Structures are given as structure tokens and as C-alpha cells.
């Protein structure tokens, strides 16, 4: 697979272990973004969210923020596989960020943000992301596919919550800023 070929290239580069995998991080980001933006369930939910919010939530803005969240999550998950860092550290830290963001996010968006993590892990994203994790763990020296290859889906579910809450907070901030000028 592509992940295996990129892992072999990284191993032969002679740089710091984590830094040698730059192409794999880019590949992981692109896989995460492209599979999510094409996810049929996300497209449907984004359109319904736009309708239900009387267009306060942009369908495209929601899809892009979820896709960026998945892409960042999968990239960080790929870094975790390469470095061998325990999964729970990232998951606990991520949920602390979610809890803090929830305190400051617009109330209307919180349920949608929490659901966005589940919506993204569907028919398009899961098979490709799972294959990426298993392929990478199989080809990084010292990693076990059984121990290190799984877990990317957890990142793909967690980080969209963070990105959608961030998107809502940015939109809220911009609206408040614009209203102060008027």
C-alpha cells in the first residue's frame, strides 16, 4: 500500500525517527480530509444542520471544519504510531480540550459538534483510515499492528468535536466583533 511505501522511504532517510515521516503525515492529513469531505453521512447531516439552523450553520463550513478535524486527528494519530506514545495520553488530553471548549461554545452547536465525531466514522473513512493505521504499524520498526495499528478511528471521532466547537467559537467571535463596530 501507499503507507508501506512511504514508511520504507522514511526509514531510509536517516533523520530523526518522527521527523523522517513527514510525507506520511501529509498523506495521513490528505486521506483524513478527502475521505471525510466525501462522507455521505456528513453531507446529509451538514445539509440538515443548515436547514434546521435557518442557515446560521453553513453546510460547507461545517463539512470543512469536520474534515479538518479528522485530518488533524489522523495526522496526530499517525505521529502516535510512529513515536509509540500511548493512546490514552492523546485521548485524555483531547477530551480535556473538548470539556473546556464546551464551556465557551455557543449552546446551539454543542450537540452537533458532539455528533460530528460519530458521523465522520462511516463507510468511506473507516476502511481507509484503518488500513492506513495497520499498514503504518506493520512497517514502522518496533511497532505492532495489533497494539499500535488501531486507534486512528478514535482520533477521527475526537478531533471533529474540537474543530466544530472551534469553528463555532470563531464564528461567534467574528459576529460579536462585527456588532461592536456597528
Annotate each PLM feature:
Residues 12, 47-59, 109, 118-121, ...:
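Juxtamembrane helix-boundary/capping and inter-helix hinge elements in multi-pass membrane proteins
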Residues 29-32, 127-134, 157-164:
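Hydrophobic cores of alpha-helical transmembrane segments in multi-pass inner/ER membrane proteins
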Residues 4, 40-47, 164, 173:
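Short helix-terminus and kink motifs of transmembrane alpha helices
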Residues 21-102:
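Helix-loop-helix junctions within the multi-pass membrane cores of secondary transporters/permeases
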Residues 1-22, 149:
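Hydrophobic transmembrane alpha-helices of multi-pass solute/ion transporters
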Amino acid at each position: 500500500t501507499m503507507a508501506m511505501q512511504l514508511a520504507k522511504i522514511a526509514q531510509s532517510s536517516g533523520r530523526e525517527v518522527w521527523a523522517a515521516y513527514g510525507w506520511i503525515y501529509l498523506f495521513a492529513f490528505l486521506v483524513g480530509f478527502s475521505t471525510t469531505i466525501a462522507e455521505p453521512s456528513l453531507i446529509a447531516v451538514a445539509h440538515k444542520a443548515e436547514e434546521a439552523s435557518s442557515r446560521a450553520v453553513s453546510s460547507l463550513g461545517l463539512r470543512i471544519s469536520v474534515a479538518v478535524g479528522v485530518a488533524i486527528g489522523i495526522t496526530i494519530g499517525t505521529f502516535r504510531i510512529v513515536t509509540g506514545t500511548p493512546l490514552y495520553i492523546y485521548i485524555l488530553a483531547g477530551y480535556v480540550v473538548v470539556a473546556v471548549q464546551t464551556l465557551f461554545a455557543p449552546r446551539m452547536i454543542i450537540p452537533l459538534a458532539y455528533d460530528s465525531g460519530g458521523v465522520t466514522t462511516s463507510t468511506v473513512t473507516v476502511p481507509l483510515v484503518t488500513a492506513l493505521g495497520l499498514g503504518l504499524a506493520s512497517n514502522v520498526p518496533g511497532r505492532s499492528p495489533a497494539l499500535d495499528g488501531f486507534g486512528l478511528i478514535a482520533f477521527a471521532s475526537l478531533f471533529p468535536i474540537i474543530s466544530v466547537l472551534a469553528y463555532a467559537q470563531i464564528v461567534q467571535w467574528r459576529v460579536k466583533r462585527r456588532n461592536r463596530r456597528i
